[in-house]
C-alpha cells in the first residue's frame, strides 16, 4: 500500500484526455469517423473553471446531416476564435440511441 499515491495531473474531460495530444490529421480522422457513424456533430464550449461543474454552452445548433469534415473544422475554429479562453469540444449525437456517441475536447482554454 505504500506505493499507492495520488497523482496530481490536469483535469480529464473526455476519452482522449488520457492520450497524447492529437495532431491535425488525427483530429480530421476522428471527425470523419464521427460523421461516418451517422452522428450529428455539435460544438460546445465553457470556461475552464466551470468545465466539470456546469453544462457546456452550445455553439449555434448541432450540424444535422453535415458530411463535410472541413465545415466542422471551420465551425470549431470559429467557436475558438469567438471564445479563446474557453474549452471547445466536439460532440457526436447519435439519433438512434438518442445519446452522445462521442465527445472530445478540441481546444483547451487558458
Curated annotation (Swiss-Prot):
Record Gene3D superfamilies: Ribulose bisphosphate carboxylase, small subunit (3.30.190.10)
Pfam families noted in UniProt: RuBisCO_small (PF00101)
Listed InterPro entries: RuBisCO_ssu, RuBisCO_ssu_dom, RuBisCO_ssu_sf
UniProt KW keywords: Calvin cycle, Carbon dioxide fixation
GO terms classed as biological process: reductive pentose-phosphate cycle
Cited function: RuBisCO catalyzes two reactions: the carboxylation of D-ribulose 1,5-bisphosphate, the primary event in carbon dioxide fixation, as well as the oxidative fragmentation of the pentose substrate. Both reactions occur simultaneously and in competition at the same active site. Although the small subunit is not catalytic it is essential for maximal activity.
Subunit structure: Heterohexadecamer of 8 large and 8 small subunits.
Record-stated family: Belongs to the RuBisCO small chain family.
Protein name in UniProt: Ribulose bisphosphate carboxylase small subunit 1
Gene field: cbbS1
Amino acid at each position: 500500500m505504500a506505493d499507492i499515491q495520488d497523482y496530481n495531473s490536469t483535469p480529464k474531460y473526455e476519452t482522449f484526455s488520457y492520450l497524447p495530444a492529437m495532431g491535425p490529421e488525427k483530429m480530421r480522422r476522428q471527425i470523419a469517423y464521427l460523421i461516418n457513424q451517422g452522428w450529428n456533430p455539435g460544438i460546445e464550449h465553457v470556461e475552464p473553471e466551470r468545465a466539470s461543474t456546469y453544462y457546456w454552452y452550445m455553439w449555434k445548433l448541432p450540424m444535422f446531416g453535415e458530411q463535410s469534415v472541413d465545415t466542422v473544422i471551420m465551425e470549431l475554429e470559429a467557436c475558438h476564435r469567438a471564445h479563446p479562453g474557453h474549452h471547445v469540444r466536439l460532440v457526436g449525437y447519435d439519433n438512434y440511441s438518442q445519446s452522445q456517441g462521442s465527445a472530445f475536447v478540441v481546444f483547451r482554454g487558458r
